[in-house]
Amino acid sequence: MKFQLKKLLLSLMIVAQLTSCATSPEAAGISEEEINIEAAKAFQEVKSKAKISNNKEWTAMVQKVSERIAKASGKNYQWEYILIDGPEVNAWCMPGGKIAVYTGIMPVLKTEAALAAVLGHEVAHATLLHGLQNYARAKQQNYYGLAIAGASAIGGALLCKTEKCRQLSQLGGLAAGFGLMFYQRKFSRSDETDADQEGQLYMARAGYEPSESIRLWERMAASKGGAGGPEFISTHPSDDRRKGNLTQWLPAAQAEYQNSPNKYGLGAAIK
């Protein structure tokens, strides 16, 4: 029984960020390799249940930009990339480099460089081990009970406003139903800021104009509507704070961009 509870908690913690207090991954008694293995299993489940987009142009762009960001990160993960056909304005990267982008975010991005900014941010969460750290935090605070309660709430579609969204939220059982719903929502504010900074460097290193990261958040703010706005930014730092931080960090990112062997600027427009 104890083993089953630990396995359940681990599956949730891959993507469900439960708290923001600090602790060390070592305290969790789990290695980066172990959590990457569990993330890979969850990703396979997502792929088996989600509707993969048949938009060849967007799929090729996601693949291309993801590969460039992955290379810029310097991590030798077993990278995988998918484009999910869904209305969510969202993207995520599981531990170990398992990336998903939703078609709903593509029209908001407008440019290839903006996609690089989003992917840079999400990949940074993985490379900075934020998922592993949150597993450690949860274990330290004995969240077994909360994990079980969360599992029983799968399918509740807590963040969804439409029937289609509620249906999509159930995809992939534990990982896609409960975990992915909260993946973007429960990183600490400090984690989000760190991912913004590191992600801006990744996009610049990959050859994309880093100032587009600032314009991206202007467009994301403009895209908000109804209750809560896009999932991708719903609990992230405020738009003004985020743009201010990215502007402050821009000189360092511009230096990375100038040193990049390939410069794509804004890249292709997203149509």
Report the location of each language-model feature.
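Bacterial N-terminal signal peptides that target proteins for export
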Residues: M1-L9
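A Zn2+-metalloprotease active-site environment signal
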Residues: Q17, C21-K271
